[in-house]
Structures are given as C-alpha cells and as structure tokens.
C-alpha cells in the first residue's frame, strides 16, 4: 500500500510537470514575439507581399507600404519568382525596459530591393535591416516610415 501511494505521488508529480511544461510553451515571451513579428514582416516585405506586411505595421507605415506596392510591377514579380523567396533570420533583438518599444536586426538573404524613386530593382545576396517595433493594443507592430533626407525616420 505504501509503494502504491508513492507511485501515485510520483505519477501526479510527472503529470503536473508535463502540464506545466505544455502551458509554458504556449506563452511566448516578449523577445519571442518581437522576433517572430520581425521575421513575418520581413518575409512579406522582401517578397513584395505588401498587404501582409501592412498587417504587421503601424498606421503611419501604411502609406509608405502602399507607395512601395505601387512600384511593384509584373517584371519585378517575375524576377522574384526566378530567384526564389528571400530568407530571413534574426541577428539580435532588444526591448526597452517598459516593454513598449523594441528593435530587431534581421538578416535577409536572396533579397530584391526596389528603389522608391524610379522603381529600379536591385538584387542583394545579403542585407541587414534594423526594424523598430512599438506595442499597439498589446500587439507588436513594425514602424517602417518613409526615410527622411537626414537618415532619420518620422515617428508615430
């Protein structure tokens, strides 16, 4: 009877640990959230899927993405199809202390970049993009505004 009781406690402990482990897997850390958001955005952005990129963007970024989308033509899409999709990985990420802003540095391989002026497309085998993220209604969004002349971006 004593062995049975010990086995029961052991089973209960194992089940508790398993349940706790499963539950904790589902809760993403802020770090994981910002990195996944950055990857999702970059995969859409650098594969010219601007409607999906917009879903991960701040309201102020929408017009810039619409402008970029208007520069994408059939020749651009054909070249993208020939080369294959851009591949994205995270190099580093940082979240501010109050968990409202973050930045993620992504490496994008096999990418095309369309220059906003003139719509000329350039192939880049590897590039880095530093993304600024802000938390809006408990969701991390990318702030990708029109680059200013002095290199700074406008803010929401």
Region annotations inferred by a language model:
Residues 1-23:
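Sec-dependent bacterial lipoprotein signal peptides
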Residues 95-156:
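Exposed beta-sheet edge and beta->alpha loop/turn motif
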């Amino acid at each position: 009877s004593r062995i049975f009781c010990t086995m029961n406690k052991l089973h209960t402990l194992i089940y508790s640990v398993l349940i706790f482990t499963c539950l904790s897997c589902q809760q993403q850390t802020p770090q994981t959230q910002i990195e996944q958001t950055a990857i999702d955005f970059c995969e859409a952005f650098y594969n010219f899927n601007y409607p999906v990129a917009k879903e991960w963007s701040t309201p102020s970024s929408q017009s810039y993405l619409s402008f970029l989308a208007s520069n994408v033509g059939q020749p651009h899409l054909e070249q993208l199809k020939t080369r294959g999709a851009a591949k994205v990985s995270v190099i580093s990420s940082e979240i501010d202390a109050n968990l409202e802003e973050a930045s993620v540095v992504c490496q994008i391989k096999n990418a095309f970049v369309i220059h906003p002026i003139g719509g000329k497309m350039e192939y880049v085998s590897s590039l880095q993009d530093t993304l600024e993220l802000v938390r809006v209604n408990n969701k991390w969004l990318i702030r990708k505004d029109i680059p200013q002349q002095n290199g700074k971006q406008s803010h929401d």
